[in-house]
Amino acid sequence: MPFISSAELSSRATPPDLQKRKYGEQSQPSEPKRQKIMGGFLDDDDDDDHDGLEAFNEAQYQSEFEIQEQRVDLPQISQSGSRAEPKRPKIMGGFLDNDDDDDDGLEAFNDAHLESQIDTQEQPVKLTEVSRSQSTLESVVINSVTERSTIVPAYAPPNISPTSVKIKTCNGKALNVPLKKPSARVSYERLIASRSTTAPGRAQKSYYGIDIHSLLNESAKEVKAAEAPKPAPVADVRPSIEAPIGDKRSKKLSTAMWTEKYRARKYTELIGDERTNRSILRWLRGWDPIVYPSLARAKQNKKYNNDEEERPHRKVLLLCGPPGLGKTTLAHVCARQAGYEVLEINASDERSRDVVKGRIRDALGTENVKGMNVELGEQKVRKVGRPVCVVVDEVDGVVSGSGGSGEGGFMKALTDLVLLDQRNSARTSERASDGRKRKGDNFRFLRPLILVCNDVYHASLRPLRQSSVAEIIHVRQAPLENVVSRMKSIFTLEGIPSDSDGVRRLCEASWGLAKRKQRGVRSTGAAEGDIRSVLVAAEWVAHKLRNESSAPLRLTRNWLEQRVLADAGGGSFFKGMNRGGVRDIVDRVFTEGAGFPDVPLGDESLQDPYDRSEAVSVDVANIKKRHAIRRLCEMVDASGDHDRCTSECFSSYPLQPYQDDTFLTKPNAAYDWLHFHDTISSRIYSAHDWELGAYLSQATSAFHLLFATAQGKAQQQYREIDEEEEEAHPFSGPRADYAAFEATKQNQAILSTFQSSFSAPLLRLFRSSNNVATELIPNVIRMLSPDIKPVVVRGSEQKSVASVRKESERALVQSAVRVMTGLGVTFEKVRIENEGGGHGGWAYRMEPPLDALVSFSKVPGFSSATNPVRYAVRQVLDQEYRKESIRKNSENLSSTGSKKSTTKSDDIETPANPAEAAKLKYGTAVKRDFFGRIIQDRVPSPQEDMEQALSRKAKSAQQELSSAGRKVWVTYHDGFSNAVRKPISMAELLSGL
């Protein structure tokens, strides 16, 4: 085979002059034998023509391909003269071409082809130095004809297929595009396997699947693993009785109950209502201008700043709701989220008024902070102090009265503290007439106060509920889905596998709810929303699940219903947690079935437990009644308030619809049961017959048996109509006597407060409160309701200003303002809220509320003593009253300063030098301008004279102190006190250094 090389020529190559001869020349006898060149390469094999033909084809194809890849400019070679040769047939691509038109160009083609091959061998180019971009391909200059298969050798030419296609561009440039090389044939199996998708981590499919040998190997391994001997089971490791070594906090949490262990400690861990959480945080952020004055965000300057839409911030927050909803936890988490440290006070344990006057007053009235000791390993580090937020828990459990030893009076002292802050906040610059400060006048709320209660309608909370000093937020119960997801995560942390249905059934049983299919429209749980009860029940179920078997069991719905709810012990445990308040119990008394789920029917439930004979059977209706009465008695006994439940049933049954005969049989039977309850209660508390305590709940059960009705759509519509009807009389219903007593007590308090602000002449005229109520107050209301038509004008900042234009109306306004000033009656701007918490507008409320004393019954035919007053009328009166108060304060200050300047001789300064004395004696010289006109000096006002005299006196006093050389020593002690203050300058502090 010939040696083929497309790179540089070796030193032993044939000289170029021997290769410039054309193919097909006949050799002469006198000349030496010429060497054969095929396709631009030397062929030394003369013996085997067939081998040379194959080598020629291969070398021709490879040289053509490599020259095209090098992409170098081929120089043109001039046509050299050649000897005339006889015409030979032309073969192109293995076919005979009889076209004689191109015979002239054939010889030029042969010469150019041979010379280009020689030049290519003389000027080798490395393949790595040639660029292969498309742009270089277009720049190649090809001056020779591309079809090189027209070489006519002396022997028959081989059949050579074309390797490129000639393309001519628009600008006349010719390009050669190589044909696509034949690729290896791909089998159908591999083509199908390449198109199929392979899952990650799975074996790659080839030839329609996995190799059968690998499958056999894997199956053999599985058989061997199954036949291998299993290891002996390891005994369960029992927990050690020794205390674990670690953090003290982790020890406490590991041994703590679930109610404390899984208490929410971050804002993101709260599962309650989001609206309630945001409302509490918004109220706490309202304290930022007071607690964090440097970090408080400045209000954005709006183009139209409507001051009326700004809601006044209230200093006290009251959280109310049923027990177990997480009110205390919510207050703690929100306070820490807002940057406070919580100071918790339990009002049930510390119910004395001294606690309010001591700890609570000091915490709220001072700008103190509270630090904490944080344990980092074995060391205790003092944490940076934070402002204090006071949380008073269970405020509805305090004693409303006041004992001799200070017991009770908690809410009264707290209410007085709130009202004192309200008075000090509303007070401007006026002081007492005698100039002395009263005790507690300067108290202000500087820290937030949060109150937590269960019943907002408790008697002890009436002052806070009726006044506008506290913002009341009703804590809503958490959604069942949130509680289920949280309990499922707790079971996962405890290592107990559970199903969602099982956890849901556990929550429903803890809340006293029925199943979804058995739950009706009016069926509610006795402890619905109580998260604490769910945690207690879940912990008890977890212990039971662990103790039943050593193998880990799964908490499912079937296991819970068969092993816990159907069991006597477990059923009584869940029923004992179904406690509710008095209002909930009374609502259940007058509901058929008491709102409980239906009892599961069985063989035992169809028999009377109090009858020994087997022949007596009980129907389904009596089974439901018996089940409801038993559960209702359990709720009454769990609440422990038997007397209140009975009295509430007595006051509520006249308003309930029930069916009875004309002889009033059911009310007579109810009175007999009330007599029975009074007899049992008196025997228990007087004769100490505690054995009769089990019969205290029977009267409540009797009311349920007599007056319970079905709760359907008709009764719901009936109740809606009753709520929409206007009340016939303010003191109507079963509790009319109590409502009248409370209203009388409230009116007496208003009268005493109004009468205490009277002057001596008014006290001589109106000595008793009855005279004030009948003679003075109706006329005062008419005086403060003048017949005027004010004009309301809004400024650029959308602040409304009301004014009157007529002189007669101005006179009426001035007389009304004089009445307000003499009696101490003011108007306070308050915000009206709708039931849903929306903004309902603004109104001016009279303080003290004298208009409430002259509004009588709403019965048709009776009207109020006065007509309703417009908002603009009271706005005009309030504006004029404020102007009058400012004017009087300025007059009092000026009169006080003038009296001091005239009575004290120290205020008059004598001239120090004789020149000033001469001026005072002979008068001052007249000042004239350039033209000789007299310049009039401005005469200072008396107020300016007083200010100049005071400034001169202060300067003289400072000179005396500096001349005397008085020294002041300043020492620092832990804390601070505002009892004694003295202004000291830096010169006095640095004078002794």
Swiss-Prot record:
It holds the Pfam family AAA. Gene3D superfamilies: P-loop containing nucleotide triphosphate hydrolases. Residues 42-51, 97-106 have a biased composition (Acidic residues). PANTHER family: CHROMOSOME TRANSMISSION FIDELITY FACTOR 18, CHROMOSOME TRANSMISSION FIDELITY PROTEIN 18 HOMOLOG. The gene is ctf18. Belongs to the activator 1 small subunits family. CTF18 subfamily. The keyword DNA-binding applies. GO terms for cellular component: nucleus. Essential for the fidelity of chromosome transmission. Required for the DNA replication block checkpoint. Replication factor C (RFC) complex has an essential but redundant activity in sister chromatid cohesion establishment. It is found in: Nucleus. One of its GO terms (biological process) is DNA replication. InterPro entries: AAA+_ATPase, ATPase_AAA_core, P-loop_NTPase. GO terms for molecular function: ATP binding; ATP hydrolysis activity; DNA binding. Keywords: ATP-binding, Cell cycle, DNA replication, DNA-binding, Nucleotide-binding, Nucleus. ATP binds at G321, P322, P323, G324, L325, G326, K327, T328. This is Chromosome transmission fidelity protein 18. Residues 1-52, 65-107, 887-915 are annotated as: Disordered. Its main location: nucleus.
